[in-house]
């Protein structure tokens, strides 16, 4: 059936891919393996070709679901698998069907025997109704097409022509969009519509070169009071449109997110070209999502300002101590001399003043005392007493913060919100005195020491306000206080499955522990005690392990890579052809098809040949950090506008993740990577990047030198593929991000065990990884300082008693076991990200029973791990090798990301992640290209001389000396490389 071009969803290549029969063991086993009944029906035919033809017809109706006449080609391996089951020659299929009637008779019999249904108007209506409902939830055409085919297959409906399915999906999606747009548009008033028109047509008053929409989209600069006020100005502008009254609560979250992302990409001129309902709806949904982002960004700036306030206090104290160090030392010497004189006078019953003046002149003594009084800091001093003058820097924005943002809390935190209301009221009324009955119980002891004036009753306005704003920050971060209209700072319980939902679903949970606390604690105690008993019996037999005098120490591991392996690896790399990075990327695109994942965000169309070259250039521009402008200058025939367009519309987060998954999955199916690992273990490590622009997401960390930066946190499999990456704050603990990568990568890797450095672990992460079924194995620095725990009494293990310094609180685990499982289940099912919830659990104000219980469960796992770690040198080596692979990956990453002195120049975290993802794709492309050509080199070595297969375990596919990263960038789309026509080795 021919369909209107506007309703085509697929390219010819995509249609072929949908109808292709994969040579997949799972597909063969599930759909093409015949039962005894199947064989009885097949064998009713006398001729071999008819038996095989009938069997093949049955097989393809099961999968992919089209009639035999629609299938253009069937892989030889599939024909062989089917023919072997029925005992005929595969070649007999060439003679089927001799008569066309035979083919149709067979199809009719299959329909009758197996209850297959022909696709008629009735099936069309049923499927369309199903698709329409799905399209209200997800507008992705490819997703809907997959769902459509799965639905028909599940209901044993024979698939019609794929163009019919395309038209049905197109119409269902169009009808769903029309319904959605009409619903949203109808709930808008004429005044709201006029305001929406205004933001895409009117220029911003103070920025004549920008529309109001362009102004609203501006990324924030560095966290400062001025930036805060600019964000609030935009937030209040959107609030002034009263869009909260628009009816969108019944719309599916996924669909809202898709439309919001589209809204963020469209320029004002594009909106003006849309039909009214579509224009108003997408704008409204985008602006409502933008209010959440602006609310979160505003509070994030407050978070940073409080951190900056406290940091400046600490630095001021350090500076005082540095400046006064010499004088303080002088006073200590005076005190020592005077003290010794006084002791002598008392013991020898001498005149105190004469003895005193013998060591220090009286006037000098008086001056020293006066100077000491000036140098003296308050008893139990910290730096908070130095913050009095810093109060006014907060006042630049905090009245606006308290006026614009609305806070809610549980009853336990009402005193804090009462204090917020008091300060808000004082700001509005202009009163300067804090009421005497203002709540103070929620304020920490540190702040309370500075809360009152010298009379002991009058509350100091400056310190009260700073204390309240600091406590507000902590409680919001912890989830005890929520912000109305926020996405990131909601009530803690809102992130989890409700107790009712948990009780209904916990029978099907994917957690790795028993739902019964008694079963859980019995099993863990048994594992715990088994390790302790073994170590107690064998502690003297472990090489490189010392447990003397209550100190646990390990000898440094010797390198285990033989020199022969290094020479062998070098000899293989010498055989690899030199190649430009542009050609390498095109080779890998031809071989893997990863570029096809860059579908257009608006119309879902895959890139054509010309667009593919533009995408490759944009990938290099971002992944090498030279930028799109420089890339356009260095690439003949391409312009900046072309690169900017594909980066905006094709290289969005979901497309980048899918392209990355294609590469990782392809690499995982090759043979050579299995010498390096089986794809079940991985490591993660951060690569700190300097930021060359002011950004809300930039942090300073003295550990990494001067300047502010962000961290690319990368996950590396044991096969040298980079399967997940994200941007995190430099001062964020790596540990809280570990589970994001393990749970949310989209590859075929089945990661069971994960390694990190010391920064990658906390007790709570140990607990959660166990609950979610992962083995967690960090390399712990200063192992001798680690606190080991026991469930039973440490005295039961006298040889180990000195290193067992704590006891697990099983009572708190028992009391909170259900809630801990509910938390873990919520993370596993994606209700909340692990990093978000772990950040809240790590906040000091949320050290409640749930956080404590998870920490205690983690201490069990950490202790078991450390016992295994010191008992097993092979485990220590495995962790070391895993981390070395991540470090090697970072080495390659830095070589590729050479532009702009390796600095990120993007302000928003989304654009920073786009650069990091492009870098990851290039890394994986290099790993694949090297692996393929190293495989060819290995095969050549096997044919031409002696060969030690064990040396392959020590290789890496991350070498880059043969790859030209520099120069003018040409992309040759005419030279098509395949697995059967790789570039020739360099043998001379």
From Swiss-Prot:
<keyword id="KW-0814">Transposable element</keyword>
<keyword id="KW-0233">DNA recombination</keyword>
<keyword id="KW-0238">DNA-binding</keyword>
<dbReference type="Pfam" id="PF13700">
    <property type="entry name" value="DUF4158"/>
</dbReference>
<dbReference type="Pfam" id="PF01526">
    <property type="entry name" value="DDE_Tnp_Tn3"/>
</dbReference>
<dbReference type="GO" id="GO:0004803">
    <property type="term" value="F:transposase activity"/>
</dbReference>
<dbReference type="InterPro" id="IPR047653">
    <property type="entry name" value="Tn3-like_transpos"/>
</dbReference>
<comment type="function">
    <text>Required for transposition of transposon Tn1546.</text>
</comment>
<dbReference type="GO" id="GO:0006313">
    <property type="term" value="P:DNA transposition"/>
</dbReference>
<keyword id="KW-0815">Transposition</keyword>
<comment type="similarity">
    <text>Belongs to the transposase 7 family.</text>
</comment>
<keyword id="KW-0614">Plasmid</keyword>
<dbReference type="InterPro" id="IPR025296">
    <property type="entry name" value="DUF4158"/>
</dbReference>
<dbReference type="GO" id="GO:0003677">
    <property type="term" value="F:DNA binding"/>
</dbReference>
<dbReference type="InterPro" id="IPR002513">
    <property type="entry name" value="Tn3_Tnp_DDE_dom"/>
</dbReference>
<protein>
    <recommendedName>
        <fullName>Transposase for transposon Tn1546</fullName>
    </recommendedName>
</protein>
